[in-house]
Regions:
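Short, flexible turn/loop "capping" segments at secondary-structure junctions
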Residues: 3-5, 75-76
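Vicinal oxygen chelate
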Residues: 1-4, 15-23, 28, 48-50, 57, 63, 75-158, ...
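Regulatory and interaction patches adjacent to catalytic/ligand-binding sites
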Residues: 72
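Short, structured motif recognition centered on aromatic/hydrophobic residues
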Residues: 8-15, 22-25, 49, 54-60, ...
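An N-terminus-focused feature that recognizes amino-terminal "leader" regions
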Residues: 23-46, 99
Length: 158
């Protein structure tokens, strides 16, 4: 049984400063910055960069001294945080993953633009795997998030 994977959407990299990381991921590697999303209630912000051929890197950085990104940086340092695979049917993927003995955590079907769950690193050789379902591109998804959940800004020349 194989999960209904549509694509490897992005790899998320935990960094202390998105601005400092841009010299590598934008200036040297040629990533095209998309929107910068801030999640104050969870203590982080994120910037996705798209690359030729469709690949993406999501830079995630803490907004302060608390939250999962800060905890990750304190214990592991900067580096790969998770990989996100887009799936055709999230509920089916969860059922199939569990049937295969994989530990699935954090199911969230509340946002119509982005539904997600995670495969525990205990089941994925130390890597967090995010499974997500969305039929919208990044810009369309951003319009559907409630304004109190995300503050959106463009990064032009950060």
């Amino acid at each position: 049984m194989t999960l209904p994977i549509r694509s490897l959407d992005h790899t998320a990299i935990a960094v202390r400063s998105i601005e400092d990381a841009l010299s590598l991921y934008r200036d040297l590697l040629g990533g095209d910055p998309q929107e910068l999303f801030e999640r104050p209630e969870q203590g982080f912000r994120t910037l996705t960069l798209r690359f030729p051929g469709g690949g993406g890197i999501e830079l995630i950085a803490p907004l302060g001294d608390e939250g999962f990104v800060q905890e990750f940086l304190a214990t592991r340092g900067e580096g790969v945080h998770h990989m996100t695979f887009m799936v055709a049917d999230l509920a089916q993927s969860v059922t199939e993953a569990r049937a295969a003995g994989v530990r699935v955590v954090g199911e969230d079907y509340t946002n119509p633009a982005w539904q997600e769950t995670f495969i525990s690193p205990r089941s994925a050789h130390g890597t967090i795997i995010q499974l997500a379902q969305s039929n919208r591109d990044l810009a369309e998804r951003a319009k559907l998030w409630p304004p109190d959940a995300y503050r959106i800004a463009q990064i032009d020349d950060a």
